Amino acid sequence: MGVYSLLVLGATTSLTGAASACQTWPSCNGQWFALQSLDLVVVWGHRTAAALTGLAVVGAAVLAWRTGASRRVRTAVTLALALYPVQVVIGAYTAMSAGAAPFTGVHLTLGVGIFASLVVALAWTLDAQTGDLPSAEWEGEPRHTDDGDPTQPGIVRAYVQLMKPRLMWLLCLVAGAGMALASSQLGAGQQLSAATVVLTLGGGVLSIGASGTFNHVLEREQDEKMARTDDRPVVTDRIPPRNALAFGVVLGVASLAAFAAVNLLTAVLGLTAIAFYSIVYTLVLKPNTRQSTVIGGAAGALPALIGWVAVTGAVGVGGVVLAGVIFLWTPAHFYNLALAYKDDYERGGFPLMPVVEGEAKTRRHIVYYIGATLASAVVLAELTGLGPLYAATTVLLGAVFLYFAIRLHRERDRRAAMRSFHASNAYLGCLLVAVVLDTMVV
């Protein structure tokens, strides 16, 4: 996480704004540890952290070679060690050029490469230590209702369950973050209107409800076989499939009307999101391929584009990169749930990764995708100029997310999988809030 902290600090405006305060290296304008201004504090903090992190990388390499780590782990750590001095030299040129674009880009790319090497080494080390160990005995499959407020009348609660409201808060946050980022692209005198926000988020809630309802109808036979889902409204006939389908159509039409009131492209993306989740993911991917989780991440990524397009009327780089963060986060998030309910998914006939590739490989891929998510969050900061709040959030919550993934390797039971699952929600939720606050408030 030391390397990651340096990456984030270098990519956010907290360091970019400080670059002009110190255009020499290794000293700062002929002085050592001159801390007369906040910019200089940031610069020296970055350089001190770089030195300490370099020592940590050296220590990791020595440890890998002296403890008999596997060849691939030694190779990955040695690669990080070899790249680090190159990164320092590029960083020096970046400082002396006041953050000129070519040096900044190379500096960021090398940093991501070092971080990726260390993440891969971590995943392989954990796999070597725990991959051959049996998982803890899973407790009996927990039964619970999928969604809804138990105080609601039965039929109302059943229709609320169809809409999968637990998905709404996070996906609406994704759209909200997309709108916040896009608002920074508006010209002088333009601002994000309340009508755009209400229509976009309202359309998002309705489209999520439509997609969830169609999913209930289309997966009712599989849901009946799974302890986690065999009490869903369509399975238990509280709502007949025909009524649920009609409800989904009404929600879908209403969502498209809300999106169309914003602009036509937003409506097109909304329709794409509904169709992708309901047809491509539910009918084609999930029952047939272990890669359904990865490819299906596109469904969760589309709200980022919807939010951006609602404000600007066109797809932009910031929206695409935010969508990429969500896409890469999805496997790191959902694989935890797939582990927790592996036997249930197997009974339902879904060839998810834990079912067909095993739990050890799934845990390893969680670490891979956490690393990819964190790296993409750095790219988002670099391209959109997000500041210190965003930087602190992705570093601190990213460390928490990674910590629980490591614990999952050690403990290998449902409780650990669900802790990692909730940590993934906390990371993304806080990151999106930080995007909104950093863009709109700070």
Swiss-Prot record:
Residues 168-439 are annotated as: Prenyltransferase. Residues 1-167 are annotated as: Unknown. GO terms for biological process: heme biosynthetic process; heme O biosynthetic process. It is a multi-pass membrane protein. GO terms for molecular function: protoheme IX farnesyltransferase activity. The keyword Mitochondrion does not apply. It is found in: Cell membrane. In the C-terminal section; belongs to the UbiA prenyltransferase family. Protoheme IX farnesyltransferase subfamily. This is Protoheme IX farnesyltransferase. The gene is ctaB.
